[in-house]
Amino acid sequence: MKTKTNVIGLHHFEEAVAMRNSRVVYDRKNSSFYTLKRGMVKWNQVLADAAVFHCSGITCAISRDAMESTMDAIKLAVADGLTIACDINYRKNLWGYGLEPHDVLFQMMQYSDIIFGDQNEWEVASGVPHIPFEALDENYEIDKEAYLAYFRKMHHLFPKCKKMVMAVRNQIASSHHTLSGLLYDAVEDQLYTTRIYDIEPIVDPMGVGDAFVAAYIHAHQKWGDKNQYCLDFSLSASAIKNTIPGDQNLVSEEEIINNMTSSGGRIQR
């Protein structure tokens, strides 16, 4: 969207090295989303012929008007019968207009059919403590019964939600992470899990969550309710993103699928 300010929102990323943590500084003031006002977007036109409306907690964090515009769009999309996909995307440093993140995110999630987030984001948005993920390698065993009970509790809070998707990460060192994924299908009352990726070295962790969500939406649209396949595809895309510099996951569907079934490292000729 072009506005009179013509400012592009930026973020500045300081990489983690050894004992030094990574740090993100946001520069979103006067960007198009920051200056968004209710009524500026003609949602009826935007949503025409759409099947899925995807919303993000980042947009809701930028300003009250951006949040209210997002909520307007969600309510209209629900009325039109669209699938609502919500990425919690909690970014503490973006919130500053007076409302509590929990209250806003909780409301957004109540309208959603599919909810994405990592373990910490689910805790902030729901108020329910997360289950620790402490994998040091790919042999770690996830407590499936504990997660099943956890997601049943989440479904009580968000009864409209049909699929709850969580990426879990353990940062062992700045360049060594373990990564896994979970999907709870509320209709089936069934939990799906993935393999654990033991990733070392990490090239760039930025955009890993976005890669996970984008891959899931793609998979869900293409393969429907093949829950295990969609989850495996999503985590594979997310894992690959850790090896790619920059914020974009420059990878093809074929590469993601190949990574699902291989250990990597081979020369592709």
Question: Which role fits each region the language model picked out?
Answer:
Residues 29, 58, 89-93, 120, ...:
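Active-site beta-loop-alpha junctions enriched in small/polar residues
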Residues 94-188:
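Conserved phosphate/ATP/ADP-binding segment of small-molecule kinases
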